[in-house]
Amino acid sequence: MSQIRWLGHAAVEILISGKRVIIDPLIKDNPLSPVKLNYLEGVSVVGVTHDHYDHLGDVVEILKMNSNAKLFATFDLEMYLVNQFKVPEAQLIPANVGGYVEHEGIRLALTKAVHSSEHSDPTGIVVSDGRTTIYHAGDTGLFEDMKLIGQVFQPDYALLPIGGRFTMDPRQAVIAVDMIKPRKAAIPIHFNTWDMIRVDPQEFVKGVKDKGYEAILLQPGQSIEL
């Protein structure tokens, strides 16, 4: 069984080829989280797009809970976590923006994102098993190279921030969908967690469908089968 489950804010759980991947695992301080931290026992890979607290989240504690889990982020961010929080180097999957990294039957890649980040460049994350490809854009504004991300990785699903202020708003995210051209659906994330990023997600859904693409609006805790 393969699925995408939204855990509120930018936290997303992906089950693919027998692996359990969690991206940007903000759980404890996430008012929309439908789960407690112990739900993440048994994860295979923890992906982090950048070092802002609402994306770095509970990564250190999750890695301690799961000694066999691997961290996937830019090497600079990984080494910050090694030096600052004593994350074991054995738990790292070193990478930077570029091509796929093969890991136990799945493929992982980092992409460009336009945002800020103190210890490393911000990124998006691509997860694929060769049959299904998911693109999590991280925190980002709209940028023209999204066309290249779509061309190179050809994602089936695009998870895009729509909350505005710190990232794209719904209107800009619709433009992003038209550049990325997801083969199956676009899914909005990073909205309505707090008042500062409160928007109407139906604006995104309608805009995406008007462009001829599918949009799936998940509630926190909801999942879709891939």
Curated annotation (Swiss-Prot):
Database matches in InterPro entries: Metallo-B-lactamas, RibonucZ/Hydroxyglut_hydro, UPF0173, UPF0173_UPF0282_UlaG_hydrolase
Pfam families: Lactamase_B_2
Keyword terms, alphabetized: Hydrolase
UniProt xrefs under SMART domains: Lactamase_B
Family annotation (SUPFAM superfamilies): Metallo-hydrolase/oxidoreductase (SSF56281)
GO molecular function: hydrolase activity
TM segment ranges: none
KW Hydrolase (keyword) present: yes
PANTHER family (alphabetical): UPF0173 METAL-DEPENDENT HYDROLASE MJ1163 (PTHR43546:SF3), UPF0173 METAL-DEPENDENT HYDROLASE MJ1163-RELATED (PTHR43546)
Entry similarity comment: Belongs to the UPF0173 family.
The name this protein goes by in its record: UPF0173 metal-dependent hydrolase Msed_2125
Species of provenance: Metallosphaera sedula (strain ATCC 51363 / DSM 5348 / JCM 9185 / NBRC 15509 / TH2)
